[in-house]
Amino acid sequence: MKTFRCILWLMLLPLWVMAVADAAAPNMGAVLKNARFISYTPRSFSVVNGQTLPASSEGITEDLKLLRPNFDSLITYSCSNGLDHVPAAAEKLGYLAIIVGIWDPKSEIEIQNSIRLAKKHPKLIIAISIGNEGIYARHYTPMDVEKTYHRIRRELPSVSLTTSEPFFLYLKPEYFDFFNKMDLLLPNIHPTFETWFNPSDAQNAATFVLNVAAKLQSQYPQPLLVKETGLPSGPASTGFTEAHQSAFWAEILKQSAPSETRAVSCFEAFDAPWKPAVTREYFPGSDHLQEAYWGFFTVDGKSKPVVNAIRLIRGKR
């Protein structure tokens, strides 16, 4: 009899462990509907002349305190070079959710850190994003992402896993099977890169983003969170201004309230003067000056008009 009970207990143990993990995991639909996401790279982090300056835990805490009055959820791009400090700082400040990013799906450090962080912060980390536009840039392959996906899944059966690419890859038939394996769609939908784009036409730009999101939802069954979209606030020589940036975000938030199946994350937290040089390495052929100006806050931590614009829209809901 004792032997039978022991065998029964061993058989039920995995189910019990899974149930505990599921109970701790955040509800994706509820988070998408209620969270105020923003993509976040610490101001203390930079890449200059090929040299990476890691983010500091003190700098991260300062950043998250500044963001907290208007945002309660974060999307990061890496979990190495200091960004592994983000979840602990966010938890102390009462953030609702984090989508932890892995920049390089082949990085052993990032893979191990993502697993460790998700286990340590099960109520905070809602998903892990394995890569950002690296398939499009040909820095890694779908097979690389899938390999890391399955490795993390074995360790974290209840955490949503995904990746992030430009929206047009999701619409190519050769990628349908790949993206269908993801638990969440996390596309980047940038109207600024379309040939028809006009910085002063906020309504058309916002409508484009939401139409693309709807098209993706008609193709895939998963919930969708637009990871990147928006307008940079400069440089003025390119036609981008703080007023145009603010108008776009006011328009897209007016047109689309978040739901359990679709939401839009703000992009991004802070200006990053070092990004144009790095972007030129990824995508040569342009100076990419606007990459320094996507922030809702300047590199000095000063809020732009867009912050007040989204606050006013949210206040009317």
Residue locations for each model-derived region?
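Active-site beta-loop-alpha junctions enriched in small/polar residues
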Residues: 40-45, 79, 101-105, 130-135, ...
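Substrate-binding cleft of extracellular glycoside hydrolase catalytic domains
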Residues: 84-168
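Aromatic- and acid-rich polysaccharide-binding/catalytic face
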Residues: 126, 132, 165-207, 225-232
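Active-site clefts of carbohydrate-active enzymes
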Residues: 192-193, 218-248, 268-276
